[in-house]
Amino acid sequence: MARMRSAKQKLKECLTGPQWREHLDEIAQGGLENIGPLFSFLLLGPLTMHRASVALGQVTARLAQQQPETAKNIIRRIMWHMNEESGNIGWGIPEAFAEILAASEPLAKDFHRILMSYIIDLGRDDNYCDNDTLRRSCYWAIGRLAQARPQLCLSARPWLIKGLEDVDMVCRGMAAWALAQLPPDLMDAPALRRLADAGNTAPCELFDGHDVYEKTASQIAAEALEGSTK
């Protein structure tokens, strides 16, 4: 037991240090035994959560090459955490989902539609995430996947545009950020301009691949608008 705690502590130290990315290959080599600790790190605050998500992506992508069914079971575990029937609030789960799909092309092809379904509100039986705080993460997750595999996320565009008018002000900014990760489209401009001009000061927490930072929803929309009209 003490050895297990020591290994978990070492893993945590690898992720919280300044050179954390240098440890990702070693973490990925650890395989399935690192999955449980990494899931637990999703609850340790924004920076550790994002870095643990990246590590989960690397571990699961490697497993997908060697043990594809095991990797799919990790995705199923993620989907269960997003399910209301699980009794859990899936903090950090959308981010982990996105990083796994960004790291693994086969898993992305199989599961990208599930990730996008969390922002699709059909007004009836659907996968829509109705927890405002968790939905912010869902928008970010789609943007993260769009960075790595934009073609898989093109069908999310109308729902991201709809997200610019989400009832949650932070969700609006996160939807704008996600939209900006897609190939530019002039059709995005009117809705982005409305949000940019709205003076929405809701702080949106973003991750640049190394650190967490904040911008307001209207700032994000203004930057996305600039990109859409180039």
Residue positions per predicted region:
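Buried hydrophobic core positions in alpha-solenoid tandem helical repeats
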Residues: 37-39, 74-79, 111-119, 156-161, ...
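Structural signature of alpha-helical solenoid repeat scaffolds
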Residues: 57-61, 98-99, 139, 143-144, ...
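Flexible loop/turn segments at the boundaries of HEAT repeats in alpha-solenoid HEAT proteins
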Residues: 23-29, 60-71, 100-111, 144-154, ...
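Eukaryotic acidic, Ser/Thr-rich intrinsically disordered low-complexity regions
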Residues: 2-16, 20, 192-230
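Conserved hydrophobic register position within alpha-solenoid helical repeats
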Residues: 23, 52-56, 93, 138, ...
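Non-membrane alpha-helical segments in proteins
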Residues: 40, 47-62, 76, 92-100
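Short inter-helical turns and helix N-cap capping residues of alpha-solenoid HEAT/ARM repeat scaffolds
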Residues: 44-48, 85-87, 123, 127-131, ...
